[in-house]
Amino acid sequence: MMKKLLLATLVGMVLILGACGNQDTAGKDKKEITVGFGVGTYEEQFRNGIVPILEKEGYKVDIKSFSQNMQVNPAMKEGSIDASIFQSTAYMEGINAEIKSDMTGIAYVPGAPQGIYSVNHTTLDDVKDGTTVAVPNDPVNQERAVRIMEELGWVKVKVDAGTTDFNLNSVESDKYDIKIKVLDPAQILVSLQDVDYGVVNGNYIANANRKITEALKIENTPLEHRIIVSINKANENTQWAKDLKAAYESKAFEDYINAQEKYDGFILPDAWKNN
C-alpha cells in the first residue's frame, strides 16, 4: 500500500514539474506578442518596419494603442502588453519607482529630439522679457525642455535639480524674464499660436507630417532621454525579446527608416554602426 502511495506521489510530482517546465518554455518561446504605444510616430515605425521582420520569423504581433502615454506602463505591469515603444530610460526609471514596476530597456529606436518651434516668430532673436514658452508637464520631458532653454541663456537651472522629479522650482531667470507655460506634451504643437515658443517632443512633429528640421533649436539628446524598447525585466532572456531587439538593430529596419523622408533629423541607434 505504501509503495503504491509513494509511486502515485512521485508520478504527481513529475507531472506538476513537467507542466511548470512546459509553461516556462512556452513563455520563453511564445510566438504571439502584444506591443503597446502611446501617442506619436513610433507605432508607424513598428507597424511598417518591424512587424514584417517578426512575421517572417513566425511571430503573430498585436499592436495596442493608448490615447495617453500614462496608460502604457500600468498595462505593462499587469501583463496585458509584452513590450512598449514610447519612452526614454529616464522616464521609465521614474515610472518604475512610482508604480513599483520592474521594466528594462532592450534596444534604442530611431527617436525624435525635442525642439523649439514657433508660429509667431521665425527666429530665437525675438526673445525678450515676458516671452512665453510652453513646456511639457511631465518631469522628465520638462527637464529636457528647460535644458534647451538653459543652453540658450534664457533660464538657469539649479545645480541640485533632479530629472524624474524635476519641477519649475528648479528654474531661475537668466538673461530674460521668461514666462513658462506648462502643457500636456501632445497639446504644445497645437497650442503654438497661444505662446511665443513651444518645446515640442519630436514624435509629435513627425506624426503631424512635419519635419524635425523646422525647429528653431534642436536638442542634443542625452542617451538617457533617447527612446527605447521597454519590457518587464523578467522577460529579458526570452527568445521573443531577443528577436524584437534584433529586429530593431537589423539592416532591414535601418534601410526602411533611411528610405522615409519623414524621419530626417531623427537620432539613429548606435547599434546600426555595426550593420
Place the predicted regions along the sequence by residue:
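C-terminal motif of bacterial Sec signal peptides marking the signal peptidase cleavage site
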Residues: L15-A19
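A conserved helix-loop-strand patch within extracytoplasmic ligand-binding domains
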Residues: I106-W154, E254
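Short, polar/charged alpha-helical segment
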Residues: G40-D62
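Ligand-binding "clamshell"
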Residues: G94-I106, V119-T122, D194, V199, ...
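A bilobed periplasmic-binding-protein/Venus flytrap-type ligand-binding module shared by bacterial periplasmic
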Residues: P113-D125, H225-T238
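Short, well-ordered beta-strand elements
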Residues: G27-G40, Y59-S65, T132-V133
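Ligand-binding clefts/hinges and TM-proximal coupling segments of bilobed small-molecule sensing domains
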Residues: P139-D165, K245-N275
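Short helix-initiation/N-cap motifs at beta->coil->alpha
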Residues: I63-P74, A161-V190
